[in-house]
Regions:
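Small beta-barrel nucleic-acid-binding modules, primarily SNase/OB-fold domains
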Residues: 2-167
């Protein structure tokens, strides 16, 4: 009886280890996949031949929400850059919503950086640890690009917008 319990536990742990290895097999290496949907300015769906459909949140940045000023512009810029294209994904982690958080490259351009540098996303200070992204935001602000081009009120960061809207 005891050996049967031990055997069952051993099989369970072996299965658990295999599932963990499968889940982590796409990290930290890069993979190539097709963008099948741009959800908003910082979230896309990719289709990978081996791993299927992957929901990806762009690391280190936060783009305006869809119903926020510049939300549709940010989404459309991202669609224009990588919509239906084969991109390279460097997986950083998986967030609490089970999305892959990563850096996307297209034709040797880092898309995360590009969006911030052109003023279509904020550096997400809460999660960012790359000076390159913070510097990109500072340059976009100085040059009054995208979200920083308004002469009126300062733009509301997406994390404050979500808090204000109760999301």
């Amino acid at each position: 009886m005891i050996s049967k319990i031990i055997k069952t536990c051993l099989i369970f742990f072996i299965c658990l280890i295999n599932v963990h290895c499968l889940a982590s097999s796409i990290t930290p290496d890069k993979l190539h996949a097709k963008v099948i949907k741009v959800v908003d300015g910082d979230t896309v769906y990719l289709k990978h031949k081996e791993f299927g459909k992957l929901k990806v949140r762009l690391a280190d940045i936060d783009a305006p929400e869809k119903n926020q000023p510049y939300g549709s512009e940010s989404t459309n810029i991202l669609k224009g850059l990588i919509g239906q294209k084969i991109v390279e994904l460097k997986k950083i982690t998986v967030d609490r919503y089970k999305r892959i958080v990563g850096i996307i490259y297209y034709e040797n351009t880092e898309i995360n950086y590009y969006l911030v540098r052109k003023g279509y996303a904020w550096c997400y200070d809460r999660y960012n640890n790359r000076l390159k992204i913070k510097n990109a935001e500072n340059l976009a602000r100085q040059e009054k690009l995208g979200i920083w081009s308004s002469q009126g009120e300062a733009p509301i960061a997406p994390w404050n917008w979500r808090k204000k809207k109760g999301k």
